[in-house]
């Protein structure tokens, strides 16, 4: 494969900034700007008989660097979120594979914005934010994949696993010989699971976490936290446990009658609204509504004239 500028391995190969971290001899983490935190994400580079790039949210400059040093043969998206697909346009003549669930709208910023926001004004704000923060440009997919698809790059093979909840089109990829699970936005971050879109579902998210756990991975690679090799079961417990923590917080807040607007102003899921406040408030409301529906179904909350109140004190 020749000289490898930018690969950060135990041998200490030199490049500044170091943007590639070896996971296996053929798989590398392409570090995202801002340490992979939103609005960026880490990407995955496969260098085998086929060179493939998974997700393009690491930053436009890093993609241009990659294009010069390790030009991919194809691009794959894990799901249609704007911090995972904004740089698809950097590779205009390559095959672009996306989940079958989002093939019809991936790469079209007008369609994605409307799907993720539900109002014309919020859609406009979303487009403005995404273009400014990520460098997003439209780039249409050429093909799609589904649950159980096997990507074969040579000696490296990845199995696509549909893991909805975060979005309807969220996938994980498994490298079966080494037990590596690429979980993308099931990211094991301290914030916990995110499910703020109309097609996001808490129950699906919990089921997807259990699907990952059942793989018994020896390593997890996430889009925002990078490589995780220690205490994987415990990390999954803590991450998934945030859902129950949020519901306890909601129940504590509903010790007296509260309106939905009071809950949004809390806020009870986001700690605050540090940017794009209208969008964050919208997603806070969506996530609160999903929790309230679950709590209503369980008889833990009841509707009132003004909003909601809990029916019993939450368990510790």
What role is predicted for each listed range?
Residues 48-50, 68-73, 89-95, 176-179, ...:
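Short glycine/proline-enriched coil/turn segments at helix->beta-strand junctions
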Residues 78, 163, 295:
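Conserved S/T- and glycine-rich ATP-binding loop of Class I adenylate-forming
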Residues 15-67, 172-186:
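Conserved beta-strand hairpin/beta-sheet module of binuclear metal-dependent hydrolase folds
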């Amino acid at each position: 494969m020749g000289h490898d500028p930018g690969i950060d391995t135990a041998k200490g190969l030199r490049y500044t900034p170091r943007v590639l971290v070896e996971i296996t001899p053929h798989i590398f983490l392409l570090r995202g700007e801002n340490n992979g935190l939103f609005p960026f994400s880490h990407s995955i580079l496969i260098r085998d008989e086929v060179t493939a790039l998974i997700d393009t949210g690491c930053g436009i400059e890093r993609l241009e660097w990659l294009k010069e040093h390790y030009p991919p043969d194809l691009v794959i998206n894990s799901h249609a979120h704007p911090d995972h697909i904004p740089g698809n346009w950097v590779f205009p003549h390559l095959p672009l594979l996306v989940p079958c669930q989002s093939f019809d709208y991936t790469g079209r910023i007008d369609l994605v914005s409307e799907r993720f926001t539900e109002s014309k004004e919020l859609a406009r704000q979303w487009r403005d934010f995404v273009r400014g923060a990520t460098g997003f440009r439209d780039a249409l997919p050429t093909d799609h994949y589904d649950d159980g698809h096997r990507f074969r790059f040579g000696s490296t093979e990845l199995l696509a696993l549909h893991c909805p909840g975060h979005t309807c089109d969220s996938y994980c990829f498994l490298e079966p010989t080494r037990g590596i699970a690429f979980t993308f936005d099931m990211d094991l971050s301290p914030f916990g699971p995110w499910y703020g879109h109309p097609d996001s579902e808490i129950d699906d998210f919990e089921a997807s976490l259990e699907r990952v756990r059942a793989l018994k991975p020896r390593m997890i690679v996430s889009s925002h936290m990078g490589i995780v090799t220690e205490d994987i079961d415990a990390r999954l417990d803590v991450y998934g446990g945030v859902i129950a923590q949020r519901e306890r917080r909601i129940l504590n807040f509903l010790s007296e009658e509260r309106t939905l607007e009071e809950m949004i102003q809390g806020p009870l899921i986001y700690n605050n609204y540090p940017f794009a406040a209208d969008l964050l408030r919208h997603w806070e409301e969506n996530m609160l509504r999903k929790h309230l529906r679950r709590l209503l179904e369980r008889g833990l909350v009841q509707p009132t004239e003004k909003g909601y109140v809990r029916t019993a004190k939450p368990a510790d």
